[in-house]
């Protein structure tokens, strides 16, 4: 349930700080600062994601920034912390951070695609979950921006439809519009 998930997340964050506190003292401030900024960015990205659920006018640039904050910065932070602790030059650590951001963006965009077109046995979760829950994904934002008037009205009708009994029909109809 949601309360257990929140408590588990809080516990993992505290444990992560405990482990980070064991770093060499000469690297500790830089590592803790980066980790703290990253944790705050992830929260900001999650807030954007929740805000986007109430909007049908999310721009692609807003979406990319949301997934950068929600997903990419975690991978970027991990790579940069590894570089810092290994004693890499700042330029290399920053390049690894940027690489992590880009890999994180690619991961999330691929996840959006696989949620529509993937094989649930390979993907590890049901296909169409983002459509069913009206997640503002790259696929939906792109479809809304390229749709003609008729297609846009149909997409908006399906987005407004919260009838769980129509879920599979909704997934099929929205997927057809993506195609």
Identify what each model region corresponds to:
Residues 1-179:
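All-alpha prenyltransferase/terpene-synthase fold signal
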């Amino acid at each position: 349930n949601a309360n257990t998930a929140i408590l588990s997340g809080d516990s993992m964050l505290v444990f992560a700080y405990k482990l980070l506190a064991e770093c060499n003292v000469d690297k500790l401030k830089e590592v803790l600062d980066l980790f703290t900024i990253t944790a705050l960015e992830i929260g900001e990205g999650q807030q954007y994601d929740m805000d986007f659920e109430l909007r049908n006018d999310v721009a692609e640039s807003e979406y990319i920034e949301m997934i950068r904050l929600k997903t990419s910065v975690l991978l970027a932070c991990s790579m940069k912390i590894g570089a810092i602790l290994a004693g890499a030059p700042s330029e290399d650590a920053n390049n690894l951070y940027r690489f992590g951001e880009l890999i994180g963006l690619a991961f999330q965009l691929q996840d959006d695609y696989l949620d529509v077109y993937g094989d649930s046995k390979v993907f590890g979760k049901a296909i169409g979950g983002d459509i069913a829950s009206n997640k503002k994904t790259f696929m939906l934002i792109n479809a809304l921006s390229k749709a003609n008037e008729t297609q846009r009205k149909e997409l908006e009708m399906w987005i407004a439809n919260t009838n769980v009994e129509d879920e599979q029909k909704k997934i099929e109809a929205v997927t057809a519009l993506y195609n």
